[in-house]
Amino acid sequence: MTYITDLPAIQDMAFCLGKEGCLFITLCAIAERITHKPIDVLRSARELINLKLLDYVEENPSQHLKEAFFVKDRDLVLAYLTGIKGITTLKTHRLSKTEKRPYYIRYATETVPPKTHFVLPDYSSLYHSLTVENGTIDSYYIIVVPKKEN
């Protein structure tokens, strides 16, 4: 078990997660829906940072917000969060109206560089996102969970 005191500078980490962690939070939400179990977002983030699957600058993290919580490998992060090996993500620009698999959406603005925000069809980590309001749907990411072997 990881105690709160085992998480160095947790307030800095929570700040960065709030500013730049929408994809990671969205992946946690998907993992919770797949496993039907709650995820401790901060502890999971720390473990994934230690595994080098999330970017995070320990020293003065608020000065490195753009690097904070960049997800290096969505599939490995989902596998870690769900405990399911072989889980994959398919990127598409069109989504079938009959799609049954879990998916999330990437919104992007046309600014340079573009601003992005990741959401579920029925959940966003922000009450109000200017990126969603002013941007457009850039792509969909469908989660493919491998069938269980008997």
Question: Where on the chain are the PLM-derived regions?
Answer:
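Active-site-adjacent structural segments surrounding the nucleophilic cysteine of cysteine proteases
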Residues: 1-65, 144-149
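Low-complexity, compositionally biased segments
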Residues: 9, 15, 43, 58, ...
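Compositionally biased, low-complexity repeat tracts
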Residues: 17, 79-82, 131
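Noncatalytic regulatory segments and standalone regulatory/sensor domains
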Residues: 19, 96-103, 107, 118-150
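Substrate-binding/catalytic groove segments of enzymes
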Residues: 36, 87-89, 127
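...with weaker cross-activation on analogous glycine-rich loops/strands in unrelated enzymes
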Residues: 57-121
